Amino acid sequence: MVMLLRARCFQRLAIPDPMRVLYKDYRTATPQNFSNYESMKQDFKIEIPEYFNFAKDVLDQWTNMEKAGKRLSNPAFWWIDGNGEELRWSFEELGLLSRKFANILTEACSLQRGDRVMVILPKIPEWWLANVACLRTGTVLIPGTTQLTQKDILYRLQSSKAKCIITDDTLAPAVDAVAAKCENLHSKLIVSQHSREGWGNLKEMMKYASDSHTCVDTKHDEMMAIYFTSGTTGPPKMIGHTHSSFGLGLSVNGRFWLDLIASDVMWNTSDTGWAKSAWSSVFSPWTQGACVFAHYLPRFESTSILQTLSKFPITVFCSAPTAYRMLVQNDMSSYKFNSLKHCVSAGEPINPEVMEQWRKKTGLDIYEGYGQTETVLICGNFKGMKIKPGSMGKPSPAFDVKILDENGATLPPGQEGDIALQVLPERPFGLFTHYVDNPSKTASTLRGSFYITGDRGYMDEDGYFWFVARSDDIILSSGYRIGPFEVESALIEHPSIAESAVVSSPDPIRGEVVKAFIVLNPDYKSHDQEQLKKEIQEHVKKTTAPYKYPRKVEFIEELPKTVSGKVKRNELRKKEWVTT
């Protein structure tokens, strides 16, 4: 097996408080300030202990602090649904319930340390319990989005060799349809009010399970979770994360980008199948002792999101750019966000126009962050720093970020190249270990002493990084290199456009030209489309460099997206090049 890097191990730290694995001076009430960014980055260091388990070394320590009266009385977990149901857990209650769940995994399901558990659940409390139970037992969590089809589930079960699956009534039939083809699968748990043949009913089992359980003493570099990529350029690949790469690594997100303290209430709207849920719905807030807030909505409803932000004491809000684009289309004048103090976005670049609309309507900036399923936060806009709209910000304390050419040489400010992370001589702790069962893919990401992210960008004179495109999204037209994001940002400023995606399209003269696939706002669907195309093209010429305007425009009802919500530009691009 090709490993991306070999971690440098430290001896187990002889410290009285495991919290100090994460940082020297534990904060309960003092937010960060990045006005002195260079000093903050230079002083940051986390020593990785030989053994680390997030459930034992973080969550259980918060329980101890609760019992000692050293933590505020706000819940550790706060869940609501759309029907008026509400649930709150302290860290002590979270610990008790997760120990019961852990006993179900080890006793009823006969799972052992290192066995793999696929969890496909919506935003219900059992999803969080499953996460912590896997940590306690040393089993490997494999999250999946509830949008997976029967074919998707079969592929993931077979590829991962999962021995157990946990899901609900909606997807249980799909699992049953493929289970016979999955030779490693021997346990099925369902979250349901009803029994189902061949399945253990988790709700019933939780009633009788013991709450006495000894957490497995995991080494920091043991596999903790496997995440499937979105699969925008081929079949999904398995990304391996360890107890330190996420369990310790995501402390960077919580401490610096999210700027969380123990009194905060953090709401992240990401789907449970995304690594972003691990980022902002599990590790980052709980590292800081903050409350994880969750709202179970069967589908995204912008008015429900705004009502929740207004009604509940949410202080930190995280959502995808698409969500912000939908939210700002609402009349928000009747909503009051008295508790909200910090808003962040990640997953794809967010358009400056959307950031400005959000600021005008809420009085709050959106702090964009950049990372991958393979990493924790790579770059971010941090509190106290000047925000440059459209920029990914500056490197997080976890990484040394460079822009490289194809030979591995570092490029000067202003020149576009590959976004890369230095991995030698010392491995950064917030980075995945390898693509599981895919050594050639793992090896392909290395260029000298750097991990190549697969994204293109540049750094400006002030040290801010700017995203251009995925490497395979770059458009080469008449000698010009054009990234889709800048064109899409110009397009979204036109009032007729709800969403857009820009790809290359073949042209006999220029080789390639920019083509825009556009989803119109409802009020513009009856307009003359030829006239509207011309208006949009002229708008882009005036908004960005004229050579970047879309010479081809096609109006469509919806954009193709992955199960994690990212636009599948490769599908649109393939359509152009195969059919032309």
Swiss-Prot record:
Residues modified to N6-acetyllysine: K151
Name of the featured protein: Acyl-coenzyme A synthetase ACSM3, mitochondrial
Membrane-spanning segments: none
Tissue: Detected in kidney (at protein level). Detected in kidney proximal tubules and in liver. Detected at low levels in testis, stomach, heart and lung.
PROSITE patterns for the chain: AMP_BINDING
Job of this protein: Catalyzes the activation of fatty acids by CoA to produce an acyl-CoA, the first step in fatty acid metabolism. Capable of activating medium-chain fatty acids with a preference for isobutyrate among fatty acids with 2-6 carbon atoms.
GO CC list: mitochondrial matrix; mitochondrion
Gene from which this protein is expressed: Acsm3
Binding residues annotated for ATP, in chain numbering: 229-237, 368-373, 455, 470, 566
Enzyme Commission (EC) number: 6.2.1.2, 6.2.1.17
Keyword list, A-Z: Acetylation, ATP-binding, Fatty acid metabolism, Ligase, Lipid metabolism, Magnesium, Metal-binding, Mitochondrion, Nucleotide-binding, Transit peptide
Location of this chain's protein in the cell: Mitochondrion; Mitochondrion matrix
EC top class, as a word: ligase
Transit peptide: 1-21
Gene3D superfamilies per record: 3.30.300.30, N-terminal domain of ligase-like (3.40.50.12780)
